[in-house]
Design a protein with these regions (language model features):
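Peptidyl-prolyl cis-trans isomerase
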Residues: 2-6, 34-38, 69-235
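Short, N-terminal intrinsically disordered low-complexity segments that are rich in Pro/Gly
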Residues: 42, 46, 65-69, 74
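Short, compositionally biased leader-like segments
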Residues: 1-15
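A mature extracytoplasmic/lumenal domain signature
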Residues: 47, 52, 208-210
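Bacterial N-terminal signal peptides
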Residues: 13-27
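Short N-terminal segments immediately surrounding and downstream of signal-peptide cleavage
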Residues: 33-50
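Sec/Tat signal peptide C-region and signal peptidase I cleavage site
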Residues: 28-32
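Short, surface-exposed, low-complexity cationic segments
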Residues: 54-68
Length: 235
């Protein structure tokens, strides 16, 4: 007991050191959590954050592709466009029913190796499942809006296909692939024109990200290497 009493000040210092280290670890975690939600843009009072971009990339949402590259303004712009489309889809009552929403969720999981892999990635990245589901459902509405509002009204004639291919004879398969490419390009043009006007009708502010952008708040899912086959979903 005398020895403990003699070294008590030193032991208290050691204990205080451990306590301080623990507090610093908690503080570091808090900083990381704050960065997870680093604001990239504001759309009429609703924010786009860094983790939105990471989820969109990881699950191939809104035409994004898996990538560990730094987040740049173009990434924020993609999500802003998605937000504008989602708002318009809501006004037009375009939206997936519960079954379609669940199918979209299952499809998102398959793109990263299955539901278990998706949940493991969300756990590692400290992502709330409800929030990730909302992004997946917004992507579903985005695709439905593009289909119903633009792609459904694009018609490519045989003459246009022939003009694109040239005078040589081509198989029906080649002609159909060309038709789909031309249809996707026309859809993209119409969508870009609509988005240009939509951006003028709403207040959008972007955060300064610098020349090099900012790093992703968490890594991509290990198996996030599959891309949607819908031609209108390319960047």
């Amino acid at each position: 007991m005398a020895i403990l009493h003699r070294y008590r000040p030193r032991l208290l210092k050691v204990a205080a050191g451990f306590t301080l280290a623990a507090l610093l670890c908690v503080a570091s975690a808090a900083v990381a959590a704050t960065f997870l939600d680093a604001v990239l843009a504001d759309v009429a009072g609703r924010t786009i954050v860094a983790s939105d971009v990471a989820v969109a990339r990881g699950l191939s949402l809104f035409g994004a592709r898996p990538s560990d590259a730094p987040i740049r303004k173009g990434d924020a712009e993609r999500l802003v466009d998605g937000r504008l489309i989602d708002q318009e889809a809501a006004q037009l009552a375009i939206g997936g029913n519960p079954q379609e929403a669940e199918e979209a969720w299952q499809a998102a999981a398959e793109r990263v190796g299955g539901m278990a892999a998706l949940h493991a990635w969300m756990d590692r990245s400290l992502l709330d499942e409800a929030r990730v589901r909302r992004l997946v459902e917004a992507d579903l509405r985005w695709r439905q809006f593009v289909d119903l509002r633009f792609r459904a009204f694009v018609f490519i004639s045989e003459a246009e296909v022939t003009a694109a291919l040239g005078p040589e004879t081509h198989s029906q398969e080649v002609r159909e692939r060309t038709r789909e490419r031309l249809r996707a390009e026309a859809t993209d043009r119409d969508l870009a024109e609509w988005l240009s006007e939509a951006r003028k009708r709403v207040s959008v502010r972007y955060a300064a990200l610098g020349e090099g952008g900012i790093p992703l708040p968490f890594p991509m899912p290990p198996l996030a290497d599959q891309t949607p086959k819908d031609p209108a979903r390319r960047p």
